[in-house]
A protein has these predicted regions:
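C-terminal helical cap/extension that packs against the catalytic core
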Residues: 181-191, 296, 304, 348-494
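N-terminal leader/targeting and accessory segments in enzymes
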Residues: 1-27, 31-46, 176
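ATP-dependent carboxylate-amine ligase catalytic core
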Residues: 6-18, 42-136, 152-154, 182
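Nucleotide phosphate-binding/pyrophosphate-handling subdomain across enzymes
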Residues: 118-121, 130-142, 146-147, 160, ...
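Membrane-proximal helix-turn-helix segments that form the acceptor-binding/catalytic region
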Residues: 162-170
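Extended acidic/charged loop-beta regions that coordinate divalent cations
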Residues: 53, 106-153, 185-222
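Short glycine/serine- and small hydrophobic-enriched flexible loop segments
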Residues: 106-112, 232-240, 512
């Protein structure tokens, strides 16, 4: 990474000139960075924010004052960086950076050229070996909540993952972490001690609310309180550093990081911090988009913990909305999972939500590339690292897994009903019908089984077709397609609530299709 940066004309001394907040974590690191950006922007600082992945366009990864750089600026900066790398390729034995490494170098180039006051850098994967870890003198480091993700790269246990995430710690640089499992915190404390980095666990937002009104967060979901609390601490250290105030640094021989900040004096947050938290926006995370007859609930949850949080959020907000609606309401799940993630871990809690239908598709926006919509969205959201066939196989596997779990759930519900009924003749008949209806339907049937309680399932080759079916063709921003038969259970619903989850790339594809709010 250092050599790639140097070939573009960026030295480590240049990187040191950037005033950086560096954030790793499994869940919520992007939201934490977004809160940091909003807080500091509301305090009048010029912010630079490098994030990943993008949802619709790659330029989203580079934000100045909270706004993605323009297409014109992106083009200019891209060719500037690429051209310098291309010119020096021969002397570097043909070496060129991989996709994320290139974007990391480009982000440093942009922030230096734009002369930002603060550069907020979100880690891509892990931390220790991440492309962003060429940063050697950040002002402060943060670690958001940990969970099992990218296990083929980072390891299959929380403590192994914690080792990688703590790899961004730097000597003498204060670091803060959201509350973590004990085994993860053990590893992080050990790494902090080895590196010489003062580590502290952030206090909850409630310590600030004790001296003031409840805080309103611009990103929905109860777990966002952890991310906001971490962001508050990161920004406090950054602003203290900016103003020349001495930041207390706990040595590795002092008390455990688990107790230090819990004893700190609570203070009321400045109005600019409160406003920054309130007006923070981070698309694709607990996001609601309402249209006539349709409400989209979008969350890129892709770990067990984040899916559980997503479900809790969805149940709360969809229930609140349903009280304001009249007529027939149906709920549809649109799902995909990718990479080395265990789909059963993500799908099982979703099965228990009681959706009327579940739709499965790859992160392919359109299956036909000559569409007007495809021409404007396909390049930024295409994944060239996997074949279309493998993506479709994964989709089918996800659907079949959902069906098996749905059948298991339904049988269990009927069994529990039988146990509480003195006269079980009706349930016996229902069970006999169920046993006859649970058959393997290899024709991509629209239903797991034929009885009324069964959830309808359907797989599609692209997001556009999936949304056409899920919305019954009511989504105005999706061009008309060939007729897709809609089952009677969903037909003529007065309102459709659609939860899109399992993959940020899926959420991005949906956002690209349904257009700006």
């Amino acid at each position: 990474m250092i050599k790639f940066a140097e070939r573009v004309g960026i030295t480590l001394d240049d990187v040191d000139k950037l005033s950086i907040i560096h954030v790793s974590g499994t869940k919520g690191k992007g939201s934490t960075c977004a809160f940091c950006e909003s807080i500091l922007r509301h305090q009048g600082y010029k912010t630079g924010f490098f994030s990943s992945p993008h949802l619709v366009e790659v330029r989203e990864r580079f934000r100045i004052n909270g706004i993605p750089i323009t297409r014109e600026k992106f083009t200019n900066y891209f060719w500037d960086v690429f051209g310098k790398l291309e010119k020096t390729k021969e002397s570097a034995d043909g070496a060129m950076p991989a996709y994320f490494a290139f974007l990391t170098v480009m982000s440093l180039h942009i922030f230096l050229k734009e002369e930002v006051d603060v550069a907020i850098m979100e880690v891509g994967i892990g931390g220790q070996y991440d492309s962003t870890n060429l940063i050697r003198k950040p002002v402060v480091c943060g670690v958001s909540s940990l969970g099992l993700d990218h296990t083929s790269i980072l390891g299959d246990t929380i403590d192994k993952i914690a080792w990688h995430k703590a790899g961004i710690f730097k000597p003498g640089t204060p670091a803060f972490t959201s509350p973590q499992p004990d085994n993860a915190l053990d590893v992080m404390e050990e790494r902090a001690s080895e590196i010489g980095c003062p580590l502290s666990v952030t206090p909850p937002l409630s310590v600030y609310e004790s001296n003031g009104p409840p805080l309103n967060l611009g990103i929905a979901g109860h777990k966002q309180r952890h991310n906001a609390a971490l962001a508050v601490q990161l920004c406090k250290v950054w602003t203290d550093h900016r103003r020349g105030n001495r930041v207390r640094q706990k040595s590795s021989k002092e008390e455990s990081c688990r107790t230090e900040l819990s004893n700190m004096e609570a203070s009321r947050l400045p109005p600019t911090v409160i406003e920054g938290l309130k007006h923070c926006r981070w698309d694709g995370r607990n996001q609601t988009i309402k249209k006539p007859g349709i409400t989209y609930y979008l969350d890129g949850a892709h770990t067990l913990e984040s899916v559980e949080q997503c479900i809790q959020w969805f149940k709360t907000v969809s229930s609140e909305e349903s009280k304001q609606l009249s007529g027939r309401l149906v709920q549809v799940l649109v799902f995909n999972s990718t990479g080395d993630r265990e789909a059963n871990v993500l799908i099982e809690p979703l099965v228990n939500c009681g959706f009327d239908a579940a739709v499965f598709c790859p992160n392919i926006v359109l299956s036909t590339l000559n569409s007007v919509v495809a021409r404007s969205t396909k390049t930024d959201v295409m994944n060239l690292t996997v074949t279309k066939e493998s993506q479709l196989n994964r989709v089918l596997a996800n659907m079949l897994l959902f069906e098996r779990l749905a059948i298991k759930r339904l049988k269990q519900q009927i069994h529990e009903t039988e146990m509480t009924q003195s006269d079980s003749s009706c349930s016996d008949a229902k069970r006999r019908k169920m046993d006859g209806d649970f058959i393997d339907k290899g024709d991509n049937s629209q239903s797991v089984c034929d009885i009324e309680d069964c959830v309808i399932t359907k797989d599609f080759p692209c997001i556009s077709s999936a949304l056409t079916w899920a919305t019954q063709g009511k989504e105005p921003n999706i061009s008309s397609q060939s007729f897709i038969e809609i089952p009677s259970k969903l037909r003529n619903a007065d309102h459709i609530q659609i939860l899109v989850t399992g993959s940020l790339h899926l959420v991005g594809g949906v956002l690209g299709l349904i257009g700006p709010e």
